[in-house]
């Protein structure tokens, strides 16, 4: 299941992020790619040692933590690493799959869910669409600034060549409490139904039963 979430970042946060990215130092993005993906990766990334990266990461992580739709859909256990990517004219990221495991040692984590937050509007650049190769065919995403696309990390995907302007995005990977994407989707749909039922009817017997089913499935599937 793919999920588009609009207005994840406020206008003030977007302005802060763009100021930080303008002041920050960027480096070749290949160093964060896997051994095969780096052969098709051509972009720049904000260096992670700088103050700009620290502050920008805090802004994005705060936005994700307060977004109820993201929390309900993803069931995040670990979010990271965060990357702030810049694509200038001629840059692209060819077809690839995300590494199943990221980090090392105590920081080793599984990539269950991928996300891209768009930091500038589509009219600021030409090309640069995120393309996911799904069972329904290729799906193209080029969203307004502050909007986000969230998807299971199982898909082949690419970023089309930027032909004009500059594309700015934040990307991250999440280890979910729920490893299986189908189980994660079922829990999300159950949660959506119970919230809707509560808003319409309040705390009824049916609502309590849904809560019981949701809680027991979460207990069965969650990996702590």
From Swiss-Prot:
Sorted UniProt keywords: Dioxygenase, Iron, Metal-binding, Oxidoreductase, Vitamin C
The record lists 2-oxoglutarate as bound by 167
- Xref: InterPro entries: Oxoglu/Fe-dep_dioxygenase_dom (IPR005123), PKHD_C (IPR041097), PKHD_hydroxylase (IPR023550), Pro_4_hyd_alph (IPR006620), Pro_4_hyd_alph_FE2OG_OXY (IPR044862)
Q: Which domain of life is it from?
A: Bacteria
Q: Which GO terms describe its biological process?
A: DNA damage response; intracellular iron ion homeostasis
* GO function term, MF aspect, one: L-ascorbic acid binding
Cross-referenced Gene3D superfamilies: q2cbj1_9rhob like domain, Rabenosyn, Rab binding domain
User: Which positions are annotated as binding Fe cation?
Assistant: 96, 98, 157
Which Enzyme Commission numbers does its entry carry? 1.14.11.-
* Ranges where the Fe2OG dioxygenase domain occurs: 77-176
Instruction: Provide the cofactor list for this protein.
Output: Fe(2+); L-ascorbate
The cofactor binding remark recorded in the entry reads: Binds 1 Fe(2+) ion per subunit.
Note the NCBIfam families from the entry: PRK05467.1-3 (NF003974), PRK05467.1-4 (NF003975)
PANTHER family with a match to the protein in the record: PKHD-TYPE HYDROXYLASE YBIX
What's the protein name? PKHD-type hydroxylase tll1907
């Amino acid at each position: 299941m793919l999920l588009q979430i609009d207005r994840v970042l406020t206008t003030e946060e977007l302005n802060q992020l763009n100021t930080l990215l303008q002041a920050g130092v960027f480096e070749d993005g290949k160093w964060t790619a896997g051994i095969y993906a780096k052969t098709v990766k051509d972009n720049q990334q904000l260096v992670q040692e700088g103050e700009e990266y620290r502050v920008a990461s805090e802004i994005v992580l705060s936005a994700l933590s307060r977004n109820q739709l993201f929390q309900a859909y993803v069931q995040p256990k670990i979010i990271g690493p965060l990357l702030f990517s810049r694509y200038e004219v001629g840059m692209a990221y060819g077809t690839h799959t995300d590494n199943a495991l990221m980090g090392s040692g105590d920081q080793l984590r599984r990539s269950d869910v991928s996300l891209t937050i768009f930091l500038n509007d589509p009219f600021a650049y030409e090309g640069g669409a995120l393309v996911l190769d799904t069972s329904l065919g290729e799906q193209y995403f080029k969203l307004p600034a502050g909007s986000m696309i969230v998807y299971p990390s199982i898909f082949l995907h690419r970023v089309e060549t930027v032909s004009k302007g500059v594309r700015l995005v934040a990307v991250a990977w999440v280890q979910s409490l729920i490893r299986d994407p189908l189980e994660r989707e079922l829990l999300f749909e159950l949660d959506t139904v119970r919230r809707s039922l509560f808003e319409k009817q309040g705390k009824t017997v049916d609502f309590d039963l849904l809560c019981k089913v949701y809680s027991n499935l979460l207990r069965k599937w969650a990996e702590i």
